[in-house]
Amino acid sequence: MDQGGGILELHKDLKMPHTMIMPDFGMSGIAHLDGEHIVVSVPEAVMVSDVVTDEEGIMLETALEAEVVEEPDICQEDVITTEGVIMSESILGAEVAIQEALSGTADLIEETVPDQVFVAELMSPHIQSPLDHNLVSAEVMVTDADTVIDSHDTLQSDVTIKADDDVEDVKSTSEDYLMISLDEVGGKLDIEDTSLKISADVGQDDDGSKEDEFSSEVIKVYIFKADGDEDVEIGSTEVVEESDFPGRHTVMESVGSGRLPREKMVYMAVKDANQEDDLNCSEMTDQVYMEVIVGEEEAPAITEAQMEDSPVNKTIVPAAWATAYGSSLESKNGAATPYLQITDSISTSRALKQKIKKRRRGETRQCQTAVIIGPDGQPLTVYPCHICGKKFKSRGFLKRHMKNHPDHMFKKKYQCTDCEFTTNKKVSFHNHLESHKLIIKNEKIPEYTEYTRRYHEASPLSSNKLILRDKEPKLHKCKYCEYETAEQGLLNRHLLAVHSKNFAHVCVECAKGFRHPSELKKHMRTHTGEKPFHCQHCEFSCADQSNLKTHIKSKHGTDLPFKCGHCPQAFADDKELQRHAEIFQGHKTHQCPHCEHKSTNSSDLKRHIISVHTKDFPHKCDVCEKGFHRPSELKKHSETHKGNKVHQCRHCDFKTLDPFTLSRHILSVHTKDLPFKCKRCKRGFRHQNELKKHMKTHSGRKVYQCQYCEYNTTDASGFKRHVISIHTKDYPHRCDYCKKGFRRPSEKNQHIMRHHKETLL
């Protein structure tokens, strides 16, 4: 038998034999005879063209090979009037039945076109209607392997997808996805609430003349196979015209047999030129096709140069291959998009009657032509390659496919024109450019550079206009070091990374650091806009008290009633003037008995004595027994205990909020055990800090022991500060403005910045 195709002729004495087309799953060369059925074994890659050739034959063409076995002793029964074509469900993934009716001439099988796939429940009202020889209809029949078609009850011709038990293993190893395109050509067929369009040919008369009521149509069923290891021409088709009907239909070019399937395609192209103008779709191709995408192995990308040499008719190329062939049916934005946006809530007739809007020249034309149904019955999302346009059902297959484009994978988006630095991160590229600016910051930046073009083209947020720089940008300088940058954000990151250790309190808005929380609180007012200090003489308000004093001195200095006789400063209150005069003249009447400290009032002197010269804490906390010098401090501390669980000691009245503090209390007070042991001298301590102090005696470093208390340290400066601040009455560092004494110069400088800032301006 010819390898290009086979012809199965029907004798006139045979009325209607059964023709069964089944896929070849390891049964090549074996014909199955079952009573009145003629079994034809056909491989997966096959083209079945049901084209009218003459009155006595039906042509069966195969792309690879087909074996036809005829049984000479076939018994015919007059009661059998059904012609059935049984195909395995694993090929199409859905149960489809194509129903064809014969014309008035019983010897000639007319060409029919199934324009829509229906569910059996939708077609139930039409099955009961009597058969009309001029009617072409379509039906879905769901049958099992043991279903018997009753020829006495129906006179219609069926194409049934049969669920074969022999191919269960094949179905379980692959996931096929069915894509069905809804045709927009033909007449209307109302099924329940859905208005669908079908088109068909009427039968011929005995003299061979055609009626002009419907236009001529062609049915093509292609099954494509493509191997990823060879460069083949896939999708080659030939449009059969009306003049080709008497002759033999040309077999399509296909790939050889014995290859693993990459993409399997069942394609049926329907063309009706008379009804294109009614649907405003004259430029689009009417398609009915089913596509199966199997992702077992990678297929090579198809370039535009290969497609120009290929004899593929692009007017009937499926939408899934349009991008690979260089068509503009789909955009190459690289996003995962479904094939069709039609859901169950949208009626099919509404989707079929959508008018295609005219687009401007140069824009892509997109048409809802297909839907991919996954194994769960839901629309499938595909992931296209933004380089070659090939689509995949998962991100994993797309990532594996991207290895075929190594030039695009390892190509960096940002390239420095001054050196060989490349990166994919915009921030890294910007920081690198800042390093060049610091070196040549005195040089003028050219008006337009290659960096300006590349940087703004690569940036997704950049506009289409090129930025021309004709002057040097403003540089933000760090006030703590010599760092300079053109962006405030980079300066903030520099402050956090470099100077945050010296400034423990950092502003979360601008990353500016401060040594004291009061300075940070004052600074935060510049971001919040809060101005708590108001002038009593006008509506002026500010965020800093020193600024308010400066305002009063400069604006209302001559208007204030109480003026100082020794300086130009004036006050609105007599007490403020008296306090200022006492501080300025140095007349402090309240002398500390323990040191040379003097205060202007008794309350200040009392605070001084309690905080400096006494170790007594008369105000105890009832919860944790912590002591404080003043009641205000105890009240502030008591707020921390509200809403917290109090841990009570079992041996005494000690209470605490911290369970670890309670454990230390029990170990140190109620037990004689010394848990912290020295490894050198085996001496025990109740607390870990006591052990640390003891370990300094074994380190070989000099230990400074205070002669007035048990304080000891290895730091000479720390020991000196301890003696001066605790055990001496001398305040050698005096303020130049108020004569207040301090033990350390840093305390004096801090005092001047807080209280005498206006005098420094």
Curated annotation (Swiss-Prot):
Zinc fingers (C2H2-type), as residue ranges, are: 383-408, 414-436, 476-499, 505-527, 533-556, 562-584, 590-613, 619-641, 647-670, 676-698, 704-727, 733-755
Q: Which SUPFAM superfamilies does the record cross-reference, listed alphabetically?
A: beta-beta-alpha zinc fingers
Q: Which InterPro entries match?
A: Transcrp_activ_Zfx/Zfy-dom, Znf_C2H2_sf, Znf_C2H2_type
| A cellular-component GO term for this protein | nucleus
**Which cysteine pairs are covalently linked by disulfides here?**
none
GO MF terms held by the record: DNA-binding transcription factor activity, RNA polymerase II-specific; RNA polymerase II transcription regulatory region sequence-specific DNA binding; sequence-specific DNA binding; zinc ion binding
Q: Where in the cell is it found?
A: Nucleus; Cytoplasm
Which positions bind Zn(2+)?
C564, C567, H580
| UniProt keyword annotation of Nucleus present | yes
Keywords for the protein's UniProt record, in alphabetical order: Cytoplasm, DNA-binding, Metal-binding, Nucleus, Repeat, Transcription, Transcription regulation, Zinc, Zinc-finger
Could you give the domain comment from the record? The sixth zinc finger contains a Phe residue, Phe-584, instead of the final His residue normally found in C2H2-type zinc fingers. There is another His residue a few residues downstream, His-587, but this is not involved in coordinating zinc. Despite the His to Phe substitution, the zinc finger retains the ability to bind zinc using a tridentate metal-binding site of Cys-564, Cys-567 and His-580. The zinc finger also has hydrolytic activity against 4-nitrophenyl acetate.
Q: What does this protein do?
A: Transcription regulator required for brain development. Probably acts as a transcription factor that binds to the promoter of target genes, leading to activate their expression.
This protein's name: Zinc finger protein 711
Q: Could you tell me which species this protein originates from?
A: Danio rerio
